[in-house]
């Protein structure tokens, strides 16, 4: 039993100091943020500020991450029509010059 506990401690210590253990966690570097769940309902357009797509090979699925005016990030399914419409809306909004 003591040998098993010692082996477990050794393995955990080795894992903690391995290159993978020292890598940044998913979500700290914006280029590797992954979405594991998508919002089920539409977000009011007026609350949205911007969006970005996640296409990292480290992520299980492609996603669109909407950023709200309150600085929240919301994951959405890019295959949903409303998500595509909102992306087009935000694209037009950013292309329109402000006077």
Curated annotation (Swiss-Prot):
Pfam families: IL8. SUPFAM superfamilies: Interleukin 8-like chemokines. Changing residue 42 to A: Decreases binding to Link domain of TNFAIP6. One of its GO terms (molecular function) is heparin binding. It is found in: Secreted. InterPro entries: Chemokine_b/g/d, Chemokine_CC_CS, Chemokine_IL8-like_dom, Interleukin_8-like_sf. O-glycosylated. Disulfide bonds join 34-59, 35-75. Gene3D superfamilies: 2.40.50.40. Changing residue 45 to A: Decreases binding to Link domain of TNFAIP6. Keywords: Chemotaxis, Cytokine, Disulfide bond, Glycoprotein, Heparin-binding, Inflammatory response, Pyrrolidone carboxylic acid, Secreted, Signal. GO terms for biological process: antimicrobial humoral immune response mediated by antimicrobial peptide; cell-cell signaling; cellular response to ethanol; chemokine-mediated signaling pathway; chemotaxis; cytoskeleton organization; eosinophil chemotaxis; inflammatory response. The keyword Disulfide bond applies. GO terms for cellular component: extracellular region; extracellular space. Residues 1-23 form the signal peptide. The modification Pyrrolidone carboxylic acid is found at residue 24. Glycans are attached at residue 29. Chemotactic factor that attracts monocytes and eosinophils, but not neutrophils. Augments monocyte anti-tumor activity. Also induces the release of gelatinase B. This protein can bind heparin. Binds to CCR1, CCR2 and CCR3. PANTHER family: C-C MOTIF CHEMOKINE 7 (PTHR12015:SF161), SMALL INDUCIBLE CYTOKINE A (PTHR12015). Belongs to the intercrine beta (chemokine CC) family. Monomer. Interacts with TNFAIP6 (via Link domain). This is C-C motif chemokine 7.
């Amino acid at each position: 039993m003591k040998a098993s506990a010692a082996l477990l401690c050794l393995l955990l210590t080795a894992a903690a100091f391995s290159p993978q253990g020292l890598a940044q966690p998913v979500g700290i570097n914006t280029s590797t943020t992954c979405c594991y769940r998508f919002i089920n309902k539409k977000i009011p357009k007026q609350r949205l500020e911007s969006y970005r797509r996640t296409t990292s090979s480290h992520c299980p699925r492609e996603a669109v991450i909407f950023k709200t005016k309150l600085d929240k990030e919301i994951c959405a399914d890019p295959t949903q029509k409303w998500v595509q419409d909102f992306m087009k809306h935000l694209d037009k909004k950013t292309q329109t010059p402000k006077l």
